[in-house]
């Protein structure tokens, strides 16, 4: 194999590189010039597009100046006109009022004014006011049915029933006479210029393509870097927003916990004052029921800390456990955080129940060394409280000792019921019967007294069985009335026995006079 050695000249390579760079620079300059020419041509084309003319009704209107027309049904124009007329009317009325006040002041100052001129001025001002009122009435009628003037030949117009378009509220009708019409422009010069520029552009397109390939490679690298930067910025922004939200939530939670603690402390103080006060049992229970309950504090964070501390106390598994046949790892029992919270809740409930039992406790608590401040409490709302809680009141009134709570009272009641036996019951009734017999022996029997009569009737009819009829029931129920009738008859007989003897004629006169007297008294009463 034959090897050939080739020697390169460094100077020839440098010259070739310089020539290539110069050519590239020249091409770039040409591209800039061509781009400027293209921009100028595009601007000229835009101006030409603006000056495209539409020939309608022998008039020339440029599209750039024409405003969009909207068809309105007569409401919008009349509403705008009405606003203008209202402002004019207000101005005219202000002028009239000012002139009238000025005229009155002149009358007070100048006593020698002519009455004829005054009458003329007042007449003219009244006519103006009447004309304004008539115009207002016409405008109202036009506003209600705006197509009165431009009404079609048909029996009724449906245009007034159509709703107004939303876009028509901000638009107004246009008139052709208000536009300034431009003059036409020769398009021949523009066409020649465009042809020359197009030729120059075609010559320079080849140079542009070569440069674009180099630029695309550079742009691709730059775009990748920019995308990475944008992603990192977005991630940082999202993290910042999340951190801000977390901080705000933590602040709100702390504030809520502080408020709940303050409320709970206040409620506990009031409960202690009520229990230590000399309030009766039924009213005291109502006060305690109507007070708000203690709010439980959220202990989510504390439970997590307790679990971490307990896990550290786990002992490693010894070899003795592995020697046994048990394959499972016998780990010690780990207490759960929720169990501690349950224990605390149960303790709080027990404390509340203990506080409920404190009736008339005058001893001060050991923790509070200070004397309790006595506050005035309005009991009117609780005394005249007709909330329909009658059942609770009845249950409370049944308790003989209001100072005892319900649980203790029920226990004592059950004990009393269990203590009574049949022998004790018989002794109790035997003693009562002896007392009644002693009373009967001491007191003589009188039919006039209702109690003795009923007792006598029951005592004599203890073991007897007899048929019950309606007549007997009525007699038994009306026994007291029968006794009263007997009293009256006996008294009348005694009175008649003591009265001196009188002839029949005198008796009749006496009865007639008494009847007339009764009639007159009744007559006056009704009148």
Swiss-Prot record:
<feature type="compositionally biased region" description="Basic and acidic residues">
    <location>
        <begin position="229"/>
        <end position="248"/>
    </location>
</feature>
<feature type="compositionally biased region" description="Basic and acidic residues">
    <location>
        <begin position="141"/>
        <end position="150"/>
    </location>
</feature>
<feature type="region of interest" description="Disordered">
    <location>
        <begin position="1"/>
        <end position="49"/>
    </location>
</feature>
<feature type="region of interest" description="Disordered">
    <location>
        <begin position="99"/>
        <end position="307"/>
    </location>
</feature>
<feature type="region of interest" description="Disordered">
    <location>
        <begin position="319"/>
        <end position="353"/>
    </location>
</feature>
<feature type="compositionally biased region" description="Low complexity">
    <location>
        <begin position="186"/>
        <end position="222"/>
    </location>
</feature>
<feature type="compositionally biased region" description="Low complexity">
    <location>
        <begin position="167"/>
        <end position="178"/>
    </location>
</feature>
<feature type="compositionally biased region" description="Basic residues">
    <location>
        <begin position="283"/>
        <end position="296"/>
    </location>
</feature>
<feature type="compositionally biased region" description="Low complexity">
    <location>
        <begin position="99"/>
        <end position="115"/>
    </location>
</feature>
<dbReference type="GO" id="GO:0005634">
    <property type="term" value="C:nucleus"/>
</dbReference>
<protein>
    <recommendedName>
        <fullName>Putative uncharacterized protein DDB_G0289963</fullName>
    </recommendedName>
</protein>
<feature type="compositionally biased region" description="Low complexity">
    <location>
        <begin position="18"/>
        <end position="44"/>
    </location>
</feature>
<feature type="compositionally biased region" description="Acidic residues">
    <location>
        <begin position="386"/>
        <end position="410"/>
    </location>
</feature>
<feature type="compositionally biased region" description="Acidic residues">
    <location>
        <begin position="8"/>
        <end position="17"/>
    </location>
</feature>
<feature type="compositionally biased region" description="Low complexity">
    <location>
        <begin position="297"/>
        <end position="307"/>
    </location>
</feature>
<feature type="compositionally biased region" description="Low complexity">
    <location>
        <begin position="319"/>
        <end position="330"/>
    </location>
</feature>
<feature type="region of interest" description="Disordered">
    <location>
        <begin position="382"/>
        <end position="419"/>
    </location>
</feature>
<dbReference type="InterPro" id="IPR018800">
    <property type="entry name" value="PRCC"/>
</dbReference>
């Amino acid at each position: 194999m034959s090897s050939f050695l080739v020697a390169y000249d460094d100077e020839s390579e440098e010259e070739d590189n310089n020539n290539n760079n110069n050519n590239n620079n020249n091409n770039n300059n040409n591209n800039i010039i061509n781009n400027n020419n293209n921009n100028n041509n595009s601007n000229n084309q835009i101006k030409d597009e603006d000056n495209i003319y539409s020939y309608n009704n022998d008039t020339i209107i440029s599209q750039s100046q024409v405003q969009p027309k909207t068809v309105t049904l007569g409401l919008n124009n009349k509403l705008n006109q009405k606003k203008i007329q209202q402002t004019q009317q207000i101005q005219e009325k202000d002028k009239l009022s000012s002139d009238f006040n000025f005229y009155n002041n002149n009358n007070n100052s100048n006593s020698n004014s002519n009455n004829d001129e005054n009458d003329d001025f007042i007449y003219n001002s009244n006519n103006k006011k009447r004309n304004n009122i008539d115009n207002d009435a016409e405008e109202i009628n036009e506003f209600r049915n705006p197509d009165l003037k431009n009404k079609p030949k048909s029996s009724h117009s449906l245009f007034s029933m159509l709703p107004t378009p939303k876009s028509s509220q901000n638009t107004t009708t246009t008139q052709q006479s208000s536009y300034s019409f431009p003059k036409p422009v020769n398009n021949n010069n523009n066409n020649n210029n465009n042809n020359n520029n197009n030729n120059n552009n075609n010559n320079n397109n080849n140079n542009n393509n070569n440069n674009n390939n180099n630029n695309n490679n550079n742009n691709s690298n730059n775009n990748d870097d920019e995308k990475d930067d944008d992603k990192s910025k977005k991630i940082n922004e999202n993290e910042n927003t999340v951190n801000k939200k977390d901080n705000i939530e933590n602040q709100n939670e702390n504030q809520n916990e502080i408020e709940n603690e303050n409320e709970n402390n206040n409620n506990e103080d009031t409960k202690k004052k009520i229990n230590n006060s000399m309030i009766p049992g039924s009213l005291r229970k109502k006060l305690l029921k109507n007070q708000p309950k203690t709010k439980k504090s959220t202990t989510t964070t504390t439970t997590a800390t307790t679990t971490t501390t307990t896990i550290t106390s786990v002992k490693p598994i010894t070899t003795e456990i592995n020697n046994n046949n048990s394959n499972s790892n016998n780990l010690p029992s780990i207490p759960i955080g929720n169990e501690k919270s349950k224990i605390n809740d149960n303790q709080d409930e027990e404390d509340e129940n203990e506080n409920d039992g404190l009736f008339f406790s005058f001893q001060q608590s050991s923790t509070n060394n200070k004397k309790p401040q006595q506050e005035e409490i309005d009991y009117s709302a609780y005394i005249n409280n007709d909330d329909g809680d009658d059942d609770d009141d009845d249950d409370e009134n049944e308790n003989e000792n209001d100072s005892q709570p319900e649980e203790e009272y029920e226990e004592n009641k059950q004990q009393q019921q269990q203590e009574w036996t049949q022998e004790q019951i018989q002794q109790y009734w035997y003693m009562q019967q002896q007392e009644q017999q002693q009373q009967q022996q001491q007191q003589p029997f009188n039919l006039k007294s209702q109690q003795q009569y009923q007792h006598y009737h029951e005592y004599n009819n203890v073991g007897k069985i007899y048929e019950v009829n309606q007549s007997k029931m009525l007699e038994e129920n009306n026994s007291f009335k029968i006794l009263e009738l007997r009293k009256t008859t006996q008294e009348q007989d005694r009175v008649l026995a003591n009265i001196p003897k009188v002839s029949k004629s005198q008796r009749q006169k006496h009865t007639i006079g008494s009847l007339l007297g009764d009639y007159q008294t009744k007559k006056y009463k009704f009148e």
